[in-house]
Amino acid sequence: MSRNELSGSLGNKVYLPNLNGTNSEKVYFLGCGKKDKEMSEQEYLSLAEKIANAAIESNTKNVHIYLPALAVKGRTEDWNFKILARTLEASCYKYFFKGKKVQSKNILSKVTLLKNVDKKGLTAFNKALKIGHVIGVGMNTSRELANTPANICTPTFLAAQAKKLSRSFPVIKTKVLGEKEMRKIGMDCLLSVGNGSAQESKFIIMQYSGAAKTRKPNIIVGKGITFDTGGISIKPSPAMDEMKYDMTGSASVIGTMRAIAEIKPKSNIIGVIASAENMPSSTATKPGDVVKTLSGQTVEILNTDAEGRLVLCDALTYVERFNPANVIDIATLTGACVIALGHEATGMFSNDQKLADSILESGYASCDRAWQLPLWDSYQDALDSRYADIANIGGRAGAITAACFLSRFTKKYSWAHLDIAGTAYGGKVGKKSSGRPVPLLTEYLLSQK
C-alpha cells in the first residue's frame, strides 16, 4: 500500500508470496471498488471473472476466497455468491483434445468461500453456493459435449451420454428411440434430415420425477444436429467447422438435466433431444421433396439447410403425449437471429405471454438474458407452399418465420422457442461453447413451484 500498488479500485490486483501471518504460499488482493458505492451488475460479473482468473493463476489446488459484502444494483448478497460460485466453476473448465482421448481439465480441486454469517444466513448462503456451483457444472457438461468434434459426437454418442447421466443419477430415466422405432410411429420429418448420413438418427427422452405423477411436467426440447453441412443445399466452406455446434440445444438439455439431478427440485421435468447428422449424398433429402410430419401435416423442403425445424417439429408433436405444463425448445436455429441480436441475447418467441415473462425474468435472474421477438399471424403467410401444408423456409425475418414454422406444431400446449444461434458459441467466448442457456433454463425450471 505504501507503494500505491493496492488501490482498491475495481479489479486492481496485487500478488504477495508467503505473506507473514498466513499459512498461504500465495495471497492475492483484488480491489472491489469504493466502499458503500453500489456497483453495476456488469461490474460485479467482471469482478467475479477476475476473482476466478486469480484463483486459476495461483496454480494451486486449494483456494480460499473472502468476499466482503458488496452492493450490486438490484441484486441480493445471495445472488452475488451464486454468481461467484458459478463463475468459478465455469472458469476452471478447459477443453483440449490430446492423443486418442478427449480430455477436459478442471484446474481447482477445492474452493472455500469465507463469510461472517449467522445460522439462518448460513442456510441461504450454502444454498446459493450449491445452486451456483451446480449450474456451473451443468454449463461445463454442455460445453464438453458441444466442443467435442463431430466425428466423435454423433447422435449415437449423444444418446450414450444421456444414458451415462442416468447411470450417475438414477433419478433420471432415459429412453432412446432409433430409426426403426421412429419410422414405426411416423417421425418421417425428423428422419428425412439424416437420410444422407451414415450415422443413425436418435430420439432421446430423459425423465426426472420429483413430484407426484399427477403433476404436469415442464419439458425442454433440444435440437441435436451433430454436424450440419446444409445437406444438398450445402453451406460455404469458411467456418463450416463451427457446425459441430449445431447440437448445442441438445447439449444444453443434457447440461440442464445434470443440474436438475443434483438440485432435486420438487417438480417433474422431461428433457427431449432430436438428433441427426445433416449430410449430402445420393440418399439425402433434396430441395422440393415433400415429407409427412408426426402431426400429419406435410412439409415442402425448399432448403435442406433449414433442417433444425424439421427435427424439432416431430419432437414438439411427440411431447404432446406427456400432457405438459409447458414446453421450451432450444436450438441454434437461424443466422438471422444473430443478425438481429448479436451474441448477447437469446431470441425468444412464445404463444403464451405468461410463460414468456417467466423466461425473461429467469434470464434476468441468471444473467443469461433473452429478448422477446414477435410471433404475429401476419408472418405465417411467408410459409405458404404450393405442394404441401407448409414450406420449411419463409424469406426475410428468418428467425421469426422459423419460429412461426414451429408454432404450427405447438397449438395444444404453452410453448416457447429459444433461438441460441448467437449465444451458444462465438462472440466474447470465441470459437468455443459458452454453456448458455443452461443458467436460464435451470433458473426457470427451479422457479416452477
Region locations from a protein language model:
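A generic structural signal for tightly packed, nonpolar segments enriched in small/aliphatic residues
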Residues: 5-6, 142, 159-449
